[in-house]
Amino acid sequence: MRRNTGLLAMTLSVGLITSGCTHTPDRYYDFTHKIPLFAPTAGDITKPDLSKPFKDSKAVASFGFQATRKVKDPFKTQKGFFQWGWFHFDEHYTTHLDSTDHYLNSDTSKNADKRSIEEYTLKDIIGPIVYIDISARVAKELAKNGGKPSPNPAVTNFSESTGATVLPSDIERVAGQITDRSWIVVHSGWDKHFVGDPPKDPFLHPYINGLNYPGFGKSAVEKLIEIENRKGVRINGIMMDNLSIDSGKSGRGSDGKNPFGDGWYAHQLGLTRGWKLLENAKDTGQLANETGKCTLIAG
């Protein structure tokens, strides 16, 4: 089964195109987290030594390992030498794009788009932004625990029951802006929890929070599909400042317990429609005060 090729070194930039007839962007924003790198442990590139960061690298949330950089012997010339080396990292590390072949349904008739990244055209990765801001609701829920996420939903709960997540009403509110090739960009403010040494159980990193974080649940995904069908359009994808576009609750499936069950609805239902998912975005709030037409360029 083909997996996605993660664009971990991508630049996710947005140019603001002013309203009217001009097509000259006058502002650009970068939504990528840096890729932190660490020296290998005893020369083993598969084992990062977090006590030996490259430059100002700091560990981040990840289901896999932290990235390593192993330096090769210098390539010498008469005037100096070239520095070079190897990198070793998970393809879903930091800001990256999930391609449409990342999730394949067991029912192959549901896999309408099975392309991987090298098969995409510019039309697949560039499109107008539709912006949704849920950060105030997320901050209100975090305030119940002094601004810190708790994996216990009795303390902080990022599901539809509290409203501290993406709701179908959020999608319906921007339905008029959704067109062919749109990018839905969601700002939750959750990225502030991204940096931090991983605990022994990576699921308990504050950013992952025991699969208790804001994002798209099944009803929000279904609302977006309903709007696509109603308008006869197909979006390019979704970008959000969280782990998976899906909410943590979505990842736990219909029984709320099983990450290996029937959940991950943005992946299960969206990727197979041709949506691309830009995960672990940074500082999506940069767009909060923009009133012109914005375009997302993933590359």
In which residue ranges do the predicted regions lie?
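Bacterial N-terminal signal peptides
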Residues: 9-16
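Active-/binding-site microenvironments in catalytic and ligand-binding cores
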Residues: 22-299
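Bacterial N-terminal signal peptides that target proteins for export
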Residues: 1-8
